[in-house]
């Protein structure tokens, strides 16, 4: 049975990757279908009710700069906002928001329902239709076939998902949802390497049974940050506190006593869990010298009594979970409303993907999110946007696009995955980016919005706002460079009290701002130097560009050197055994990874600069040197 309409792009899955993928393809004018097993769970926050953080906030800002929905939904759902690393340099500052689950889901669903070119349909997908190594559609659980030349799979943890609580386990995509068994079996027939990963979630606690007076209150920031470049503080709902408590030796003894019934430590779970978000069992085992671990007590929303205890993800049996929770200060009488659990699921080796997130073996088939071995809403959303965009570009007969490592954290994410692969759930950190001074949260729109407009991702309202911001920044920078103060100026007596060293020679306003003791806000408040920019984001940009100009310029010079051969393309059908001078190890690694560019090849472990030189000579001799997009 065939559906009565044909589509350009089909997106399978309605989580964070799927929603961004569907919205991106539709924004670009492609007739898009989003298939989900349950319309009510579109945009669901399956684990932690929070968006952003170190590295992750950078991804959210980049999604936003390209017209995505995640940051906007966070501004409407965020019940506590904080800027992490606020005392450090701008490269590692990151926005994090605690979100109301219900409000977030409602906003995402509202955005989806109002998106032109997007159809949403409730049906689980069981099969792919492939013809001559090209995807041509999907078949749902009830045998309904949908046709499209491009399909984006965002199956999350649903592929052969298995939920573990103690030594009990059952099939599930997440608590309360069925797994995708038939689709998982179909995907295992494809020539793509497959593995198993696991992730987990903590028990949810009834807030009415917690004694918050025994915990440390953690308030949000003042003034309140916003997540979206189009956001406003007025969009935020009521703001509330989170709380901090700690495990103790009694907690650790309870956990150790239950390890014989832990699926992780009894060999029941084979999948590898996230290194940077370990279960409490893992923490006790790996950090046995620590007598306590911090727990963030995070409300799940304004109209629910559920609390998310961030830091005690566990798959221990329920009785052990209850005892360990009640051993924690402030939770002596706590009641669990949902048990914690681990979930094991299929993922596919991202080295079998192009950097467009299209599979190398099946044309038109794109993967995004946890199916590629990542963990986190933000990582999923970034991949979804990229995959949806490239699916639309392909249907429109245009070249694929992916930002380079020096252009976006999205570029770092995709390059790491497609070049190096991953054996554990991959999480983004600022430390993964070698050019992080240029990849800041504050300039994500400056880096990406113009490209997003060119690709058709950015609407008129965002473009107008961005253009106005760019113009005001440029005009203010010109003003600061062109206005000067002389030692005998009447402004000097007003200015000198604010300086560590009094003015002794002619100086531009820009030079004054570059002084360590001066900032933009302070300078603009001094009579004769203001009023300056009213837009705080534009003002922040002016300050950073002036104060860090030397460092930024040096990093840009490094990038210019590095990209010389970065985009030199490598034929996917090149047999590296035919390249004279390469060692057997290098040949094996290159034939296994099949890198798309010289840049990707150079980042594969064990590939030496000498091997890269040999490759370049070989390509030149055979007239194969080409530059990719």
From Swiss-Prot:
Name the GO terms of the biological process aspect. Answer: tRNA methylation; tRNA wobble uridine modification
User: What SMART domains does this protein map onto?
Assistant: GIDA_assoc_3
Write down any Gene Ontology CC term. cytosol
The principal location of this protein is cytoplasm
Location(s), subcellular: Cytoplasm
Essential cofactor(s) = FAD
A molecular-function term among this protein's GO annotations: flavin adenine dinucleotide binding
Q: Which residues span the membrane? A: none
Q: What InterPro entries does the record point to? A: FAD/NAD-bd_sf, GIDA_C_N, MnmG, MnmG-rel, MnmG-rel_CS, MnmG_C, MnmG_C_subdom, MnmG_C_subdom_sf
Domain of life where this protein originates: Bacteria
Gene3D superfamilies annotated for this entry? FAD/NAD(P)-binding domain, GidA associated domain, C-terminal subdomain, tRNA uridine 5-carboxymethylaminomethyl modification enzyme MnmG/GidA
Q: Does the keyword Flavoprotein apply?
A: yes
- Keyword set, alphabetical order: Cytoplasm, FAD, Flavoprotein, NAD, tRNA processing
Q: Which Pfam families does the UniProt entry name for this protein?
A: GIDA (PF01134), GIDA_C_1st (PF21680), SAM_GIDA_C (PF13932)
Q: Which NCBIfam families does this one have?
A: mnmG_gidA
Q: Which family does it belong to?
A: Belongs to the MnmG family.
Subunit structure, interactors included = Homodimer. Heterotetramer of two MnmE and two MnmG subunits.
Task performed by this protein: NAD-binding protein involved in the addition of a carboxymethylaminomethyl (cmnm) group at the wobble position (U34) of certain tRNAs, forming tRNA-cmnm(5)s(2)U34.
Record-given protein name? tRNA uridine 5-carboxymethylaminomethyl modification enzyme MnmG
In its UniProt entry, the species of origin is given as Shewanella sp. (strain ANA-3)
Q: What is the lineage of its organism?
A: Bacteria, Pseudomonadati, Pseudomonadota, Gammaproteobacteria, Alteromonadales
Q: Which gene encodes it?
A: mnmG
């Amino acid at each position: 049975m065939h559906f009565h309409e044909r589509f350009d792009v089909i997106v399978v899955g309605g989580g964070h990757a799927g929603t961004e993928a569907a919205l991106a393809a539709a924004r670009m004018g492609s007739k898009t279908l989003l298939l989900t097993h349950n319309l009510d769970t579109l945009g669901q926050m399956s684990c932690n009710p929070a968006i952003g953080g170190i590295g992750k906030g950078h991804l959210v800002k980049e999604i936003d700069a390209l017209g995505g929905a995640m940051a906007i939904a966070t501004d409407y759902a965020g019940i506590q906002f904080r800027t992490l690393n606020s005392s450090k340099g701008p490269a590692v500052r990151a926005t994090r928001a605690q979100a109301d689950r219900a409000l977030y889901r409602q906003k995402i669903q509202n955005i989806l329902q109002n998106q032109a070119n997007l159809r949403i349909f409730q049906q689980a997908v069981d099969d792919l239709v492939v013809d001559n190594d090209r995807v041509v559609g999907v078949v749902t659980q009830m045998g309904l076939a949908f046709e499209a030349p491009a399909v984006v799979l965002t199956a999350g943890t649903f592929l052969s998902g298995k939920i573990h609580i103690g030594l009990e386990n059952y099939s599930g995509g997440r608590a309360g949802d069925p797994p995708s068994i038939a689709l998982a079996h179909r995907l295992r027939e494809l020539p793509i390497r497959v593995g198993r990963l696991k992730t987990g979630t903590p028990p949810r606690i009834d807030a009415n049974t917690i004694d918050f007076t025994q915990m440390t209150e953690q308030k949000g920031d003042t003034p309140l940050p916003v997540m979206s470049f189009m956001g406003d503080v007025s969009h935020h709902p009521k703001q509330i506190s989170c709380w901090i408590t700690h495990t103790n030796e009694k907690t650790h003894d309870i956990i150790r006593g239950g390890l014989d019934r832990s699926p992780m430590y009894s060999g029941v779970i084979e999948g590898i869990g996230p290194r940077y978000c370990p279960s409490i069992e893992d923490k006790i085992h790996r950090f046995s010298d620590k007598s306590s671990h911090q727990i963030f007590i995070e409300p799940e929303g304004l109209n629910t009594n559920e609390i998310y205890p961030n830091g005690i993800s566990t798959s221990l049996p329920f009785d052990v979970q209850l005892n360990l929770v009640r051993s924690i200060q402030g939770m002596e009488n706590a009641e669990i409303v949902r048990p914690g659990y681990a979930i094991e699921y299929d993922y596919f080796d991202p080295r079998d993907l192009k950097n467009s997130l299209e599979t190398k073996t099946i044309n038109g088939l794109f993967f995004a999110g946890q199916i590629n071995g990542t963990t986190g809403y933000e990582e999923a959303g970034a991949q979804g946007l990229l995959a949806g965009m490239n699916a639309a570009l392909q249907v429109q007969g245009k070249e694929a696009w992916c930002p380079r490592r020096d252009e976006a954290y999205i570029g770092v994410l995709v390059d790491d995955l497609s070049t190096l692969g991953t054996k554990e759930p991959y999480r983004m950190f600022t430390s993964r980016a070698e050019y992080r001074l240029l990849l800041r949260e504050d300039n994500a729109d400056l880096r990406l919005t113009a490209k997003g407009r060119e690709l058709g991702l950015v609407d008129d309202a965002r473009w107008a706002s961005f253009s106005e911001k760019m113009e005001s920044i440029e005009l203010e920078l010109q003003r600061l460079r062109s206005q000067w103060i002389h030692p005998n100026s009447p402004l000097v007596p007003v200015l000198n009290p604010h300086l560590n060293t009094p003015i002794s020679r002619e100086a531009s306003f820009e030079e004054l701002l570059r002084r360590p003791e001066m900032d933009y806000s302070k300078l603009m408040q001094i009579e004769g130097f203001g009023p300056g920019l009213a837009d705080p984001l534009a003002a922040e940009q002016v300050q950073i560009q002036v104060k860090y100009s030397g460092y930024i310029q040096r990093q840009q010079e490094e990038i210019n050197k590095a990209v010389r051969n970065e985009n030199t393309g490598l034929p996917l059908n090149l047999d590296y055994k035919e390249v004279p001078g390469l060692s057997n190890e290098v040949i094996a690694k290159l034939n296994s990874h099949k890198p798309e560019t010289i840049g990707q090849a150079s980042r594969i472990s064990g590939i030496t600069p000498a091997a890269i030189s040999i490759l370049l000579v070989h390509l030149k001799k055979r007239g194969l040197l080409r530059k990719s997009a």
